[in-house]
């Protein structure tokens, strides 16, 4: 498809929309660039290519007979979770403080994300403890988390692309070359979140617990309390495969230096159950289910962070 920029203009608006035929079975990457010639004296040379990832429609997961029976039992006790099973709309607001360690976040970032999450009943749910699991776009944060991971790694121009000098090696660039990673390579990044514990309601309000422990990156015998997302990142999978094989000394050498792609090394760098940063941004982590709303609030930080980010999540069912 071709979009024409009218004479005398420097920009044009266009939309990429679904034809709703459901023919996309897997993620597809589209590239949007500029076709030359252009009046470079007026517009400069446009080198960037915009890459858009088109994803297939989300689908709800089928429940087993046992899970359906659990839902009926919860409903009898005053907690109707059946309406929260499926593809649920979500709105997320994120406030990231200024980050001196990353050029892309030098002024911080405020952004609102809208999307959908696939929610199902966890395999660990019991009659006494309702537990939900988010299997696709948990908390509506997949796009945000992948963006932050890329900012810390493959898009980190300040620290990952330095000139090592004659006869030396930049381990970050060497690691990327080893696994075929670049700013433009097509990668996949997915998240899930299990063990979302929902209390039976008290005066129509259910408390929702969603935090969990993760090994501290500096001392794996210690746990830090975070939102325990499980990550599946294609570039890290390739690097980890080399590390697990144990026969690639270069891969291990680069990672020992710090050139890793493990999402847990960059996302939720600190615990969020206490105010470790003391920067004025900490808030009590909270999850609440009431009526047609399921809301969460919690903090987040990353490897180069200058303080806590503030995240607020709201799921709202149609009336």
Residue spans of the language-model regions?
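Ser/Thr/Gly/Pro-rich, low-complexity flexible regions
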Residues: 61-319
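Acidic/polar, low-complexity intrinsically disordered N-terminal segments immediately downstream
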Residues: 1-99, 308-319
């Amino acid at each position: 498809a071709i979009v024409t920029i009218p004479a005398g203009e420097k920009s044009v608006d266009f939309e990429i929309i679904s034809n709703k035929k459901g023919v996309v079975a897997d993620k597809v990457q589209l590239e949007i660039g500029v076709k030359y010639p252009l009046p470079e004296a007026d517009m400069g040379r446009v080198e960037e290519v915009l890459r858009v990832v088109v994803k297939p429609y989300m689908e709800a997961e089928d429940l087993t007979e046992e899970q359906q029976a659990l839902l009926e039992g919860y409903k009898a006790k005053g907690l109707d979770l059946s309406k929260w099973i499926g593809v649920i709309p979500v709105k997320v607001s994120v406030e990231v403080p200024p980050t001196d360690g990353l050029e892309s976040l030098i002024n911080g970032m405020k952004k609102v994300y809208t999307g959908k999450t696939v929610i199902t009943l966890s395999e660990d749910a019991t009659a006494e403890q309702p537990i939900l699991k988010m299997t696709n776009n948990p908390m509506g944060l997949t796009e945000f988390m992948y963006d932050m991971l890329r900012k810390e790694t493959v898009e980190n121009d300040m620290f990952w692309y330095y000139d090592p000098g004659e006869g030396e090696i930049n381990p970050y660039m060497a690691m990327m070359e080893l696994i075929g990673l670049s700013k433009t390579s097509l990668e996949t990044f997915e998240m899930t979140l299990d063990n979302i514990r929902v209390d039976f309601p008290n005066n129509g309000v259910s408390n929702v617990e969603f935090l969990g422990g993760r090994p501290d990156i500096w001392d794996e015998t210690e746990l830090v309390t975070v939102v325990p997302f499980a990550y599946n990142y294609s570039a890290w999978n390739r690097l980890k495969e080399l590390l697990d094989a144990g026969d690639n000394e270069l891969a291990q050498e680069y990672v020992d230096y710090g050139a890793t792609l493990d999402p847990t090394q960059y996302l939720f760098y600190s615990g969020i159950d206490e105010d470790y940063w003391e920067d004025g941004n900490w808030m009590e982590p909270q999850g609440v289910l009431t009526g047609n709303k399921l809301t969460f609030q919690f903090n987040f930080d990353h490897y180069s962070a200058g303080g806590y980010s503030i995240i607020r999540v709201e799921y709202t069912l149609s009336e």
